[in-house]
Regions:
Chain C
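Gly/Pro-rich hinge or "lid" segments in bacterial periplasmic/extracellular proteins
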Residues: 78, 167-239, 247-248, 357-358, ...
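Structural transition elements
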Residues: 198, 327-366, 380-385
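Ligand-site clamp/hinge motif
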Residues: 219-271, 282, 402
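Surface-exposed binding/hinge segments that line
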Residues: 88, 99, 133-179, 186, ...
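N-terminal lobe/hinge region of extracytoplasmic solute-binding protein
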Residues: 41-91, 119-122, 193
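Extracytoplasmic/peripheral linker and loop segments enriched in polar/acidic and small residues
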Residues: 353, 399, 404-413, 421, ...
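Ligand/substrate-recognition segments at binding pockets and active sites
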Residues: 40, 246, 328, 361-432, ...
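Periplasmic-binding protein-like
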Residues: 296, 300-340, 387-388, 488-496
């Protein structure tokens, strides 16, 4: 077991290295000139050259790559071209709303997904099952940006239950800041719930077919105990896997909902950075997302191996 | 043959429904020029933002173009992009997956790279690539294929590995059959199922992601109709012309829904074991 | 006798009490006006807040509350001394002597004097592109005494004072505290000490700018009229929120989250009219949509080809496609609108707004156009640019001209347009409100970024332009203006398609708001 953990941790290194390479080259291969955007249309060639030099953008690509790599190992992600602050600082500031949205979406998704999945499995082939299948299918089929706009239209513009956009940080508004995050989280939760419901349902269906369940039934155990105590626990493994693997997708989803609801999180920051070629921020955002995904996956795999000693990485 | 036999054996509400919807969509997109007289890109700005009427079933957009027409052609675009992405993903993913599964030396290197690629949500890779290569249908197809093929490669690789050491393959090898023959005869046949299932889900994903990319402005170039771009355009007019945003959104949902249904149905049909084998940690999006 | 006295006394008393009550009421209303935090929604965010170091007009618009100029424009575009008390122009325009107001307080408590103005001016001259227009003609600035300054020119430059107050982009000259100018030099300023009715509080990039009332503000004694005259800070605090999405800006005002939103979709005008809580603010057509040619690349290095496109387009249809509701746009051929002293009534006659595809094709033949696709380069983020490009492509293709449409995000557009090849047509919104034709945003001379224009015709234009610069006599200058307009419509290095209005909206409880070319929030209060 310990060897497995060590092996996986060691594997992180080459993966993150490759991720860094990909992040750097993707960013710096994008056409578009941030310097001219900063200086405006009337900038002269000499002004452009001057700014390029002070930003270090006139160096050859390979050199910039190694300099950047050396810096990030030290934890220095450079300074944003537009936000006038070190990237690591900006990333840290924007982390909270994104995490809140992601966690809220995940929690909402898990609770409703589990519920829906269990209901479906227990009522296999009956109306409730069909209903749950259909609902979860819709969940994974609706484009998140469209859903966000629909929700905004109905609940914010027409009903006025939630603010349309923007964000007040926790420090200022306390729990009031959650008002701004509910619709974005719900948008993302739809898809999570759909995925989790589907996985739960199929895992439960398989488990419920097993012999030991039949034994428990014949023993006369109540349905509730069978479902929750035995079946659910043993179905959790694939569900947890699905949750873990979809966390990356969830993070990707925050980019879109943050943009639509104007929440100053890491996703909005990343999209803005791409739109105006804020190179240090783009690089950092890409690495950030990838690293989180890799770490979460590691977690999932480890807990997986932990919970099911039968499966091991070859 | 086995496929059809299995099909007739059980009831398949999912597959049937989804195939019906998909045939309908295919019909709409193929016969778009016949079904509507209007040109999807010709402007008629003096007639902008008209509500649905007899002349314009779904009204007109901000350029006076007939929305119904654009929806039909937009479906066609989504289908084209989805199909192209699926084909490319299957080819690339298949080749890489088979190579990795069959030749263990390759496997180590390839898997590391694939793992790293899969560390990014597909949409982010696609956005970045689209930003680099520029917008446009071809670039979107390439960008999405690039984002999806690692997953496909992985699936193929798993299938290959599970087959590779089976008895009948070993005996084929012992008898001196060439690698390529083995690959084609046994491996492809057995990985066909997971490939088909994943391909269907990729089709759905491609439609969603193309819409998202067009929404963000890095997708299909105007004036070509794209359902996602139509949603973007409609945002500004949402309150005065809600039909502009409802129609394309519903279309996207319909297309994606039916494809997901099909994928589910196929998976149930082809290999019930695939559903949630602990080894196969499949991701539906 | 006593009875009369009594009655008179009572009447007087009543009158006194009445007028006291009235005054108290008025005073109380004035008092009542004070207070509140204004939330305004703007569409773009800024990279920093230093107007000398950027061409972003939003920086100036916001910082107009923090900084003031020596001169400002009023609502009739009359140049008005603001931080200046008075001025004199001598020696045929070679010397300007400016007297400053003497008791104007800076945000740091000190009194503004010539040192502050001179330091700010030198910086403006060096960095700001308005200053760079002036610099080639300028000699030096001298301090006469603590409140008097002399500006000396090597060559007469008629637009000088107009540029100082310019409402275009970032061009305006503002007075900053000397200590800040010394501290930052040419680097981006992030500590702000000005003389304006509001002072800088906080800036969160991509989110908001917060300003709070400057309690010791010293207003001008002239009558308030847009940027000139007395500014009263009723609001305690002003928060500029950066909200790129138009619908979100709109929804914010509908729900009361914002009191003001700029640039909202004009198509929603009827909705706002119907809403009791929202007022429409239509800014009169102060924007032009310019069609800009790449004059260095075939086919548009030939003036016949350039003229051809003007004939090939149905301008009215473009109006509907680009802007929409006709109450928000109008066709206008001159660079200056009717009512502006520089308006030339018959500019572009015979070509502007004339839809003649046949003639267009003839002209293209005459120019030797080989049929290669024409590349239209435009930005995605601006509605006019985007919809205009799509509409123009459609119109040109309908008459058989091949067009390649390139819509990109702003950084890519900026990069591609700065090159001499690869694009043919570009659309850009220009500001129409220009008090002086020679600080016209589009007219900073030929061979600049907008035109890539370098030919016999461009040199002729340069000459006309130089003549105008030297001519101090208004009437003679206007004649030169007429020549310039007719030359512009003959060689057409670029042309304006139409003028359009922007629509802002505000909550009904925001009172006394005046819609000008840049939104400002002094003299306006919340009920």
């Amino acid at each position: 077991m310990r060897n497995y953990i060590i092996k996986r941790l060691l594997l992180l290194v080459p993966i993150i290295l490759i991720v860094a390479v990909i992040a750097f080259f993707i960013t710096n291969l994008m056409p578009g000139d941030p310097v001219r955007v900063i200086l405006g249309n009337m900038a002269t060639e000499s002004e452009v050259a001057r700014l390029e030099q002070s930003l270090g953008l006139d160096q050859p690509l390979i050199m910039r790559f190694f300099r950047w790599l050396a810096n990030i190992i030290k934890g220095d992600f450079g300074e944003s071209l537009y936000l006038n602050a070190p990237v690591s600082e900006v990333l840290f500031e924007r982390l909270r709303p994104t995490l809140f949205i992601a966690v809220m979406a995940e929690v909402m998704g898990i609770t409703s997904g589990l519920l829906l999945g269990i209901l479906a499995a227990v009522n296999h082939r009956k109306v409730l099952d069909q209903f749950s299948i259909t609902l979860s299918l819709f969940g994974i089929s609706i484009p998140s940006f469209w859903l966000a706009l629909m929700l905004m239209f109905v609940f914010s513009v027409n009903l006025g239950w939630f603010p349309v956009s923007g964000y007040e940080p926790f420090a200022e508004a306390g729990f009031g800041s959650f008002r701004y995050l509910i619709l974005p989280a719900v948008t993302l939760a739809f898809m999570q719930a759909g995925l989790i419901a589907r996985m739960t349902r199929s895992a439960m269906l398989d488990t419920l077919k097993q012999d030991y369940i039949r034994t428990a039934k014949s023993k006369g155990l109540s349905r509730k105990i069978i479902v929750f105590k035995h079946a659910l626990k043993n179905s959790m493994l694939p569900v947890i896997t699905v949750i873990g693997h979809n966390f990356a997708v969830l993070l990707g989803g925050t980019w879109i909902v943050e943009t639509i609801f104007v929440i100053p999180g890491t996703g909005f920051m990343a999209i803005n950075a791409i739109m105006r070629r804020d190179i240090p921020v783009i690089q950092a955002s890409i690495i950030f997302v990838a690293v989180i995904y890799v770490i979460i996956n590691l977690f999932v795999d480890l807990s997986y191996a932990f919970l099911n000693p039968k499966i091991r990485y070859h | 043959m086995l496929f059809l036999k299995k099909y007739k054996k059980y009831e398949h509400p999912y597959i049937t429904t989804s195939i019906i919807i998909l045939i309908l969509l295919a019909f709409l997109s193929l016969f778009a020029p016949v079904l509507t007289d209007y040109n999807p890109v010709r402007n008629d700005a003096r007639n902008r933002l008209q509500a649905p009427s007899r002349e314009h079933l779904l009204g007109t957009d901000q350029f006076g173009r007939d929305v119904f027409t654009r929806i039909l052609y937009g479906i066609r675009t989504s289908m084209e992009v989805g199909l192209a992405v699926v084909i490319l993903t299957v080819i690339f993913g298949g080749v890489v997956g088979i190579a990795a599964g069959y030749y263990p030396q390759l496997d180590k290197v390839v898997m590391r790279i694939l793992d790293a690629m899969m560390a990014f949500p597909g949409i982010i890779i696609a956005i970045s690539l689209a930003a680099i290569w520029g917008a446009g249908k071809l670039n979107i197809i390439l960008a999405l294929s690039f984002a999806y093929f690692p997953k496909m490669a992985r699936i193929v690789r798993s299938a290959v590995i599970s087959i590779k050491d089976l008895d009948y393959v070993d005996s084929a090898r012992a008898v001196g059959a060439k690698d390529s023959r083995i690959i084609f005869k046994y491996i492809l046949k057995n990985s066909a199922s997971p490939i088909m299932v994943q391909a269907t889900f990729n089709f759905a994903l491609a439609i969603l992601d193309e819409a998202a990319l067009s929404f963000l402005g890095v997708g299909i170039m105007p004036p070509a109709p794209s359902l996602g771009a139509m949603v973007t355009d409609a945002r500004t007019y949402m309150v005065v012309a809600p039909w502009l945003i409802l129609a394309p959104g519903i279309m996207i949902v319909l297309a994606v829904l039916s494809l997901n249904l099909l994928g589910d149905g196929l998976r149930d049909l082809l290999d019930p074991h695939l559903k949630n084998t602990l080894k196969n940690r499949e991701v539906k999006k | 006798m006593r009875k009369e006295i009594k009655i008179t006394a009572v009447v007087v008393l009543v009158a006194l009490v009445f007028s006291l009550l009235l005054t108290a009421n008025v005073l109380a209303q004035e008092e009542d006006r004070y207070g509140g935090t204004l939330n305004a929604a703007f569409q773009m965010s800024v990279a920093h807040l230093d107007s000398d170091n950027s061409t972003d007009s939003l920086i100036t618009a916001m910082m107009n509350h923090v900084y003031e100029g020596l001169f400002e424009f009023d609502e009739n575009l009359n140049l008005t001394p603001h931080l200046a008390e008075s001025y004199q122009v001598g020696e045929d325009g070679l010397v300007y002597e400016v007297k400053l107001r003497e008791n104007v307080k800076l945000h740091n408590g000190q009194t503004m004097d010539a040192d502050d103005v001179i330091a700010s001016f030198r910086r403006w001259l060096e960095l700001n592109n308005g200053g760079q227009l002036v610099a080639p003609y300028f000699d030096q600035v001298e301090k006469i005494d603590q409140f008097n300054i002399r500006f000396k020119f090597a060559e007469a430059y008629a637009p000088f004072l107009n540029i100082l107050a310019s409402p275009v982009s970032n061009q305006k000259f503002v007075v900053r505290a000397e200590e800040v100018v010394d501290e930052f030099g040419t680097d981006v300023i992030d500590r702000h000490v000005g003389t304006g009715p509001y002072k800088y509080e906080e800036w969160v990039p991509d989110q908001k700018l917060v300003l709070t009332r400057f309690e010791d503000y010293t207003p001008s004694s002239r009558e308030a009229s847009f940027f000139a005259g007395k500014r009263t800070a009723y609001l305690d605090e002003i928060v500029f929120n950066f909200i790129p999405d138009a619908q979100v800006r709109v929804s914010g005002v509908q729900t009361g989250q914002f009191h003001f939103a700029e640039e909202v979709p004009r198509d929603q005008y009827p909705l706002f009219e119907a809403n009791q809580n929202i007022d429409n603010v239509i800014i009169y057509p102060d924007r032009m949509s310019m069609l800009i040619y790449n004059n260095a690349e075939a086919p548009f290095d030939n003036k016949y080809a350039r003229q051809a496109i003007a004939y090939a387009l149905d301008f009215e249809e473009l109006g509907y496609a680009m802007i929409g509701d006709p109450q928000f746009w109008r066709l206008e051929s001159a660079l200056h609108e009717e009512g502006n002293p520089w308006h030339v009534p018959d500019a572009g006659e015979g070509i502007y707004g004339v839809y003649d595809p046949e003639k267009a094709k003839e002209l293209l033949d005459q120019a030797g156009y080989d049929g290669d696709p024409i590349v239209i380069l435009s930005g995605q983020d601006n509605q006019m640019e985007r919809q205009g490009a799509i509409a123009i492509q459609d119109q040109l293709e309908e008459i058989g001209i091949d067009v390649e449409l390139q819509l990109f995000d702003r950084p890519t557009v900026v990069e591609r347009r700065s090159k001499k090849e690869g694009w043919h047509i570009h659309l850009s919104p220009f500001i129409k409100i220009v008090p002086d034709p020679q600080i016209h945003q589009g007219w900073t001379g030929t061979n600049k970024w907008i035109s890539n224009w370098d030919s016999e015709e461009s040199r002729e234009m340069d000459q006309i332009f130089a003549e105008m610069l030297r001519e101090v006599d208004q009437e003679k200058r206007y004649e030169i203006m007429e020549r310039m307009q007719s030359k512009l419509w003959d060689s057409v290095p670029y042309f304006n398609i139409l003028d359009y209005s922007r629509l802002h909206i505000k909550r009904a409880e925001l009172k006394d708001f005046k819609g000008s070319w840049q939104p400002f929030f002094w003299n306006t209060y919340l009920e």
